[in-house]
Amino acid sequence: MKVLVLGGVAAGTKVAAKLLREDRSCEVTILTKGKDISYAGCGLPYYVGDVIHEKSELIVNTPEKFQKLTGATVLTQMEAVAVKPDQHKVEAKDLKTGEQKEYGYDKLVIATGASPFVPQIPGLELKNVFFMRTPDDAIRLREAVESGTIRRAVVAGGGFIGLEVAENLAAQDIKVTVIDFADHVLPNFLDPELSEYVENKMADAGIMPMTGVALEGATGTEKVEKVQTSRRAIKADALILAIGIRPNTAFLEGSGIEMFKGTILTDKYLRTNVEDIYAAGDCAMVTNRQTGQPAWSPMGSTANIAGRILAKNLAGGQVEYPGVLGTGVAKLPGGLNAGRTGLTETAAKAAGYDVISVVTVVDDKAHYYPGAGNFIIKLTADKASRKLLGVQVLGAGAVDKVTDIAVTAITLGASVDQLAAMDFAYAPPFSTAIHPFAHSINVLMNKMDGMFDSMTPAEYQSGAAEGYRIIDCSPVPSLPGKQYLDLTAVNGEVEGLGKEERLLLVCAKGKRAYLTQNRLKYYGYTNTKALEGGTTFNEIEEEEE
């Protein structure tokens, strides 16, 4: 069987390598537009920051090495320009010579990936305008940084790549501003209140977030001197564009392959609507496992999983690709890590779920162990089924562990009741006696069962605390101007507090506020709310009583 693969980064090379392990008799040829194959695109920002010292560390395989390891033929700098399904041929252009060639196939795999979105704005021809998609992009930016000519930079795009580039530039004493057209950084990845927390941490780290603004261009004589936005001009020596990507599928026009928003549609076996043509990776649309709706997931993890399944199917299997949960993790500015899987609260409501959510602040390991910190965990669940729908987590520690536990839980359809009693690993250097995830699940269960009456950070930010008296429940007074209440002294009616008065109980993380609420309820106080996340997550307005 002659298999032609278009694209040689993640999905394409995974298909080729796995297929030749499954069926050595296959003749596999890869055509790829670039000079490099199988490179770690997600590691490029860390090469810019010299965390990864050598370009070679990002190149998983050279074309020559890959050919020897797998038996596939790799032809670089070959750009596919047309697919002819009726002839079972692909027309490609040799970028070295300009010559047009045709390649036949029995089976065709389209894994052409995606390219950076290039906005139609003035000034992109200036020096020190950079993208961040290929090793060559990272090399150019790192060389400019090491030359000492970049003191101020604007990163356009507040997604993963943009924030990772910003962090690595700031670590080299470059003043960085991150702009994004969305209202918050990491749009669609985190709910707004968590994104706002990330923005505050960015500012604390000296990186200025500027959201809700449009990039309008760059100005300068030979190189970038200013970046123009819809709000104001920003002095800058460099502009890094990380404002999204677009699937590389324009060459498929007229092929008859069904498309959706520029991506290739496939079935559960990764077949297109055209016989003998398959697709995987950033150029293909996948399905959200929870909603069943189309979901574009241009992630290296998605590409590799889909590529492996596709290879097994080409070798005669019938393996279904189950789709994605929107899982991701990122290292962010300010010593913060972020993870998410499943639906955000915003997405869950849009999908029609009857949603309940909670924000917790929990220890990430035994509090007395060196290096202990906090996780901020937001859980979203369906009230009726009590099934977990999504998790968002922020912290300096191993947020991927919490995220991956949630991936398993959501995939297997676990209820919060099942998750609360899971036998998670514990030792002081790694976790708490009740795992941070399980602790958060317990808080959510208390809320679902009516034992915990709370005000969410989003509600607090929207003004829901109006009419409430804020009560400081910390171990020692911590909120200037607010009434202090010592939990250990609550053994009956509290002088000065009405039993029907609206009271907002606030502590550092939320736990002591809950304990205070529990005791006040026993003594007849019927109108209390505990602020989720406490002062660790929320900024308490200082108002005169």
State where each predicted segment sits.
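Rhodanese-like catalytic fold shared by cysteine-dependent sulfurtransferases
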Residues: 418-428, 432, 439-453, 463-469, ...
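Mid-to-C-terminal Rossmann-like scaffold of FAD/NAD(P)H-dependent oxidoreductases
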Residues: 1, 283-397, 431-432, 436-463, ...
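Rossmann-like dinucleotide-binding cores of NAD(P)H-dependent redox enzymes
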Residues: 59, 152-153, 160-217, 299-302, ...
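A Rossmann-like FAD-binding core segment of flavoenzymes
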Residues: 25-27, 69, 75-96, 103, ...
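FAD-site-proximal beta/loop scaffold in flavoenzymes
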Residues: 125-149, 220-226, 233-309, 406-409
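Glycine-rich dinucleotide-binding loop and its adjacent helix/turn
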Residues: 110-172, 208, 261, 266-268, ...
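Hydrophobic beta-strand scaffold positions of dinucleotide-using enzymes
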Residues: 5, 28, 109, 240, ...
